[in-house]
Amino acid sequence: MFAKRSMRLALVLVAVLALAVTITAVDDVGASSAGVRKGQSVRYLDVGASVSVGVQPTPLVPRGQPTNEGYANLLVKLARATGVTLHLAKIGCPGESTLTLITGHDPCYRTVDNQLSDAVAYLQIHHSSDVLVTIDLGFNDVVRCLRNVTVNAVCVRRQMGRLQRRLPTILKSLTLATGPNATLIGVGHYNPFLAAAVTGAKNTKFAHANEAVIAQLNSVLKTAYAKYSIPMADVAGSFRTNATTLIKSSTFGLIPTNVATICASTWMCTPPPYGPNLLPTTRATD
């Protein structure tokens, strides 16, 4: 059960990331996008939050823990099958926001250290190497605004503004540290809250209300990445976020395609103790 669910989620992300790598290799998007070629040995730096480190519910930790079943691990396997060796360094932290990425003070970086400084140090050490970097941020900055089946519009505006201010700091630091043979890829976000549509009329209203929030989040991220010539993987598209055609679910009857995709690909429609579970985690700081 666990392997099936985690594999299903991770494979979707892997497919999108692989496409993005192919695009950078063919189109040479930006000075920092060298692409990867068959036979290469590439350093792979995985920056981000819960999904970046493969957080999944397990029998011992039903609410989730880091695993080796995330998209980064499967991207390594996918690359190996095409003749590219990725040496993976996962430095992400469950619940990481853009603030804690910069300042630390999270469950993973409790001293003066932080994920951003570790990422910069890694890139500087491997400045002359072929390097792939995936950046998976933003969700934990806004998830606090989507609580108790309510969209807090004031909170959304505040957090989007903070995200727009912090992202340039992060992306500038990363791009300045990269060498000429580095490929950076941003990771967009799916909408786990669509799953609320299977739990009653009030929750269905919430599911629709937060669609604009996730769309705005992806827009903010894409704009920020574009300023640094970093392509963004369209995760929302791969999760068929805008597909509303009704299909039959063996569990929930007729439901929209986008809701069915979330239920099949995440733990959001799973009963306790393993769900509902956002993955990424809802824990965040400011």
What are the functions of these language-model segments?
Residues 55-69, 97-110, 154-158:
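Acidic/histidine-rich helix-loop elements
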Residues 90-98, 238-241:
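Acidic helix-start/capping segments at beta-turn-to-alpha-helix junctions
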Residues 2-30:
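Secretory targeting and sorting signals
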Residues 110-275, 282:
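Alpha-helical cap/lid subdomain in secreted, periplasmic
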